[in-house]
Amino acid sequence: MSELKQIRIYTDGSCLGNPGPGGYGVVMIYKQHRKELADGFALTTNNRMELLAPIVALESLKEPCDVILTSDSQYMRQGITEWIHGWKKKGWVTASKTPVKNVDLWQRLDAAAAKHKVDWRWVKGHAGHAENERCDTLAREAAEAKPTQIDKGYQP
């Protein structure tokens, strides 16, 4: 088997109002190549955008890859590395027997991550990390651009 391509992915989500207009930003780096992704939604939450960013990034990869995925979202990182195992066992309910919020995105993230070898990393937000700052800018600009796209899974 050939060696997997090594990709670095940085992600961030933003929401103005929470709920409100939101956006995500992604920076993907492979060798000397760099790709940026961003999109906005008319009504969503910060957590949904924090989940959508890595989903879009991982789903955009055309083959299985060795991924280092860095985010400033403890919610996303802890959810995908710790909480999700229990949620799946319990039929997508939390320890307190309530339905998992954003289950549509958790299931998509789980499926997207399963195709790759992912090292989930956390970086403190707004601490001068260049790629994280760029993702923050992309996400915020997408949210501020008066997006009209509907986040179909958002439930108030």
UniProtKB/Swiss-Prot annotation:
Catalytic activity: Endonucleolytic cleavage to 5'-phosphomonoester
Subcellular location field: Cytoplasm
Keyword Phosphoprotein: no
CDD domains the UniProt entry points to: RNase_HI_prokaryote_like
Cofactor(s) demanded: Mg(2+)
PROSITE patterns hit by this protein: RNASE_H_1
Keywords: Cytoplasm, Endonuclease, Hydrolase, Magnesium, Metal-binding, Nuclease
GO BP annotations, alphabetical order: DNA replication, removal of RNA primer
EC number: 3.1.26.4
Domain of life of the native organism: Bacteria
Domain RNase H type-1: 3-144
Cofactor binding, per record: Binds 1 Mg(2+) ion per subunit. May bind a second metal ion at a regulatory site, or after substrate binding.
InterPro entries from the UniProt entry: RNase_H (IPR050092), RNaseH-like_sf (IPR012337), RNaseH_domain (IPR002156), RNaseH_sf (IPR036397), RNaseHI (IPR022892)
GO molecular function: magnesium ion binding; nucleic acid binding; RNA-DNA hybrid ribonuclease activity
Entry binding sites for Mg(2+) 2: D12, D136
Keyword Ribosomal protein in record: no
GO cellular component annotations of the record: cytoplasm
Predominant place of localization: cytoplasm
Positions that bind Mg(2+) 1: D12, E50, D72
Function: Endonuclease that specifically degrades the RNA of RNA-DNA hybrids.
Quaternary organization: Monomer.
PANTHER family, per database record: RIBONUCLEASE H1 (PTHR10642:SF26)
Similarity section: Belongs to the RNase H family.
Annotated protein name in UniProt: Ribonuclease H
Source taxonomy: Bacteria, Pseudomonadati, Pseudomonadota, Gammaproteobacteria, Alteromonadales
